[in-house]
Amino acid sequence: MIDSKQKIAVLGAGSWGTALAALVARHDYPTILWGRDVRVIQSIDIQHQNFRYLPSIMLPQTLRATTDLAAAVSGADWILVAVPSYAFTETLCRLAPLLSIGVGVAWATKGFEPGSGRFLHEVAREILGGDVPLAVVTGPSFAKEVTLGLPTAVTVHGEDVCFTQMVANAMHGPMFRAYTGNDVIGAELGGAMKNVLAVAIGVADGMQLGMNARAGLITRGLNEMLRLSAVIGARPETLMGLAGLGDLVLTCTGDLSRNRRLGFALGRGQSLSDAIREIGQVIESVQTSDEVMRQAEQNGVELPISEAVRAVLREEITPYAGMKALLAREQKPEYLDILFKANCSL
């Protein structure tokens, strides 16, 4: 039974924040959505539509929206942050002095902190302190499909079991499954890397390289996820689940994926600036490719697909040159090490 006093504040009125706010509002949780754009907030609060990011989709009439951050978080039982990665640090800095004791913070932001390459849970812990319950929401989920009520499955990872379950319970419903776990690093890694890898698949599709190439890039991209996860302390099963493989497949094959659309445009010969302008929304891979490679270089892990994507997004090489370089790599064993080690205690 839902606690009638429980209130959820969602920070970020883009497509994903709006979708998640609408989801929990439909599950009868008192929900308020915060955003910066006055016109967007007014359209949500008055017309019950996000005219900019989710046009023509009706939102629950019980969903409230505001541009006042203090008003949004006042009395909230927990907070869900759904802003782009470049705004994550600033948003938490503004939130910290407004946060009441015992209020947990979850986020559906994917990526790393731009510039430092830090995982977002590291940023959150530093800004919010050690006593605030934290959790990350991730998995294969297009905002439009969630808002339309189409079947979706995500996973919520956090060290605080009670808070993690609270977040999952609010989201879980007839058309939305929310699983739980405690591998925050793995969950964040999958959500960040899939955006970079989706650009490579988009490029291949734009160049009309065929379904074989797409399948090969997705599989070898998953291998890159697993190899990096092995050296940073993430669990391979997390990357083989919704947070990794699930999100990777959706982002690499779905036409709603902005990162795939960016790669597709580049593969068709469009310039980076024109492609970004045409898509018209934040494309996480543009910054995340730098941070993924920063993690790889710091840990001595070779990520050829991610490295090629970074070079293309920096406009150091053409998409054609990037694909040619990947195909010209020397022959080698498919696996250089055991990715999954048997647990004899099971």
Curated annotation (Swiss-Prot):
Which positions does UniProt annotate for NADPH binding?
S15, W16, R36, K110, A143, R258, V282, E284
Question: What Enzyme Commission number(s) apply to this enzyme?
Answer: 1.1.1.94
Q: What is its main location?
A: cytoplasm
| Protein's UniProt keywords contain Hydrolase | no
State its location(s). Cytoplasm
Sorted keywords for this record are: Cytoplasm, Lipid biosynthesis, Lipid metabolism, NAD, NADP, Nucleotide-binding, Oxidoreductase, Phospholipid biosynthesis, Phospholipid metabolism
Report residues binding sn-glycerol 3-phosphate: K110, G139, S141, K194, D247, S257, R258, N259
Q: What are the catalytic residues?
A: K194
Any one GO CC term of this protein is: cytosol
Pathway the protein acts in? Membrane lipid metabolism; glycerophospholipid metabolism
Q: Does the keyword Lipid metabolism apply?
A: yes
Report the catalytic activity.
sn-glycerol 3-phosphate + NAD(+) = dihydroxyacetone phosphate + NADH + H(+); sn-glycerol 3-phosphate + NADP(+) = dihydroxyacetone phosphate + NADPH + H(+)
One term of GO molecular function: glycerol-3-phosphate dehydrogenase [NAD(P)+] activity
| Top-level taxon of origin | Bacteria
**Top-level class of the enzyme under EC nomenclature:** oxidoreductase
| InterPro entries per record | 6-PGluconate_DH-like_C_sf, 6PGD_dom2, G3P_DH_NAD-dep, G3P_DH_NAD-dep_C, G3P_DH_NAD-dep_N, NAD(P)-bd_dom_sf
Where are the bilayer-spanning segments?
none
What PROSITE patterns does this protein's entry cite? NAD_G3PDH
Q: Which GO terms describe its biological process?
A: carbohydrate metabolic process; glycerol-3-phosphate biosynthetic process; glycerol-3-phosphate catabolic process; glycerophospholipid biosynthetic process
What is the annotated role of this protein in its UniProt record? Catalyzes the reduction of the glycolytic intermediate dihydroxyacetone phosphate (DHAP) to sn-glycerol 3-phosphate (G3P), the key precursor for phospholipid synthesis.
Question: Its family?
Answer: Belongs to the NAD-dependent glycerol-3-phosphate dehydrogenase family.
Q: What NCBIfam families does the record tag this protein with?
A: PRK00094.1-2, PRK00094.1-4
> What is the protein name stated in its UniProt record?
Glycerol-3-phosphate dehydrogenase [NAD(P)+]
- Quote the gene name from the UniProt entry: gpsA
